[in-house]
């Protein structure tokens, strides 16, 4: 009898841990999205308004071009395809928009990525979704493409910051020590 009570108590204690581990991939994606949203928005916001046209070479995207790409071709499109949540109506931005407008649009696009993935489960990752053009792929592949796009453009922005004598957000000293 006593052994049964201990077994029941142990099982009940394990339930929250099991429930939390039911969507490890989707949960990891949400964590990466939060992290990248913070770093990318902070990186763009670090540039003075007069530097939004900066690009190291004529062939590369400017800071404003990166921000517009992430808003218009990146976050709304990719997060919608990855999660199945339709893109919301939003004011279009282009490279002539003010720094404030570009940062606000970027933040809003990441807010959409965050909210659209809130109910995403690992069970949905094998679902077939529209990719680019007529192609289909899995929801998981679209999530990976989205994360890859964030990583690519954060690296680009971090390099632009360093080339302008600034330390990117991910290299900033952490508050409170380590």
Which positions does each model-derived feature cover?
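Boundary of Sec targeting at the N-terminus
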Residues: 20-23
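Acidic/histidine-rich alpha-helical segments that form the ligand environment
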Residues: 40, 95-130, 137-153
